[in-house]
Every structure is written in C-alpha cells, then in structure tokens.
Amino acid sequence: MKSYLLVSMLLLLNSILVYIYTKNVQILVSGITVAVIIYIVVKIIFERFVHQ
C-alpha cells in the first residue's frame, strides 16, 4: 500500500471517529475533504514526478 493512500485512510478514519464522539458534522466534512485533497494532490505529484 502506498504511503499517501495510508495517510488518507488514517485521516479519514480519524475524522469518522471524532465525528462519532462529538457529533459535529463540520469535523466529518472537513476531514473527508482534507483526506481526498491529500490523496489526489500527492498521487498526482507522485505519478508525475517520481514515475517518469
């Protein structure tokens, strides 16, 4: 498993757990958004510059 995928999944899991305990939807939405942004940006950078 690639490290950026692992970081995105852990961040997503963390935001879900925080949502379960706080019932704050804003934390859940921001966590999902950040996880998706990290995954997409790092994947693009990794594929474009590392795998040439």
Curated annotation (Swiss-Prot):
One of its GO terms (cellular component) is plasma membrane. The chain crosses the membrane at residues 1-21, 27-47. Keywords: Cell membrane, Membrane, Transmembrane, Transmembrane helix, Transport. It is a multi-pass membrane protein. Induction: Up-regulated upon UV stress. It is found in: Cell membrane. Part of the Ced system, which is involved in DNA import. Forms a complex composed of CedA, CedA1 and CedA2. This is DNA import protein CedA2. It comes from Sulfolobus acidocaldarius (strain ATCC 33909 / DSM 639 / JCM 8929 / NBRC 15157 / NCIMB 11770).
